[in-house]
Amino acid sequence: MKEYLNFLQFILDHGVAKTDRTGIGTKSVFGYEMRFNLREGFPLVTTKKIHLKSVIYELLWFLRGDTNIQFLNDNGVTIWDEWADENGDLGPIYGKQWRRWHCPDGRTVDQMQRLIREIKTNPDSRRLIVSAWNVGELDQMALPPCHLLFQFYVADGFLSCKLTQRSADAFLGVPFNIASYSLLTHLIARQCNLKAGEFIWSGGDCHIYNTHQDQVSTQLSREPRALPQLIINRDPSSLYDYNFNDFSIVNYHPHPAIKAPVAV
């Protein structure tokens, strides 16, 4: 994944010093795009080991419409713990918006269900979009959505996805987001009798935290390795019925993990 290393280097070369909500400080650029051909392998960063278990369980959690960390914790995933309240709740974040978007008239919309229906019945639509940025509920969220909107595109039997991310933690967050939405693209493609085409990542405020500078330097010193392959072992009748054991990543041979503090 040379594209990702180029992204890190671009921030180092062109970024400006900025303050931020966490008080840590960043080097930041505004606007960057990366493209990954999902037919050439699964875009899982190889210059450090990615905790794939967390990627998969978080996506399954989103698809459940869940906003409490209990499901994650029960499966050994703690990536949302810092933001949860004493009851494990996070407010109306991603899962709630994907599956139960509240309308002014009191209705709720299952955006994922509507998306799949539209892909199947109107694949040339330019409205194949899911948004997590519900302005009316932002103040109730433990953390407003960083990856806030994604759009799909169907052509020649392939399904492609473009993710828009307003705030991009380049070292810790972005590799995770690339893997998560690439997996989602594969799942939706299979549910719609399509093949996964391309994943496009588009970032707004793309930043490296000051506390991640050494880790980024270490990662840039490493040579990328061949991408692994995603194997999906089962196709349930519903997008929401996948489980962790339905997925295998083969030929993933990353460099060792690089630890870094999370900016809360």
UniProtKB/Swiss-Prot annotation:
GO molecular function: thymidylate synthase activity
Known role: Catalyzes the reductive methylation of 2'-deoxyuridine-5'-monophosphate (dUMP) to 2'-deoxythymidine-5'-monophosphate (dTMP) while utilizing 5,10-methylenetetrahydrofolate (mTHF) as the methyl donor and reductant in the reaction, yielding dihydrofolate (DHF) as a by-product. This enzymatic reaction provides an intracellular de novo source of dTMP, an essential precursor for DNA biosynthesis.
Name of the protein described by the UniProt record: Thymidylate synthase
Keyword Phosphoprotein: no
Subunit structure and binding partners: Homodimer.
This protein's pathway: Pyrimidine metabolism; dTTP biosynthesis
Gene: thyA
Provenance organism: Coxiella burnetii (strain RSA 493 / Nine Mile phase I)
GO biological process: dTMP biosynthetic process; dTTP biosynthetic process; methylation
EC number: 2.1.1.45
Family: Belongs to the thymidylate synthase family. Bacterial-type ThyA subfamily.
GO CC aspect terms: cytosol
Residues forming the catalytic site: C146
Keyword Cytoplasm applies: yes
Annotated positions binding (6R)-5,10-methylene-5,6,7,8-tetrahydrofolate: H51, D169, A263
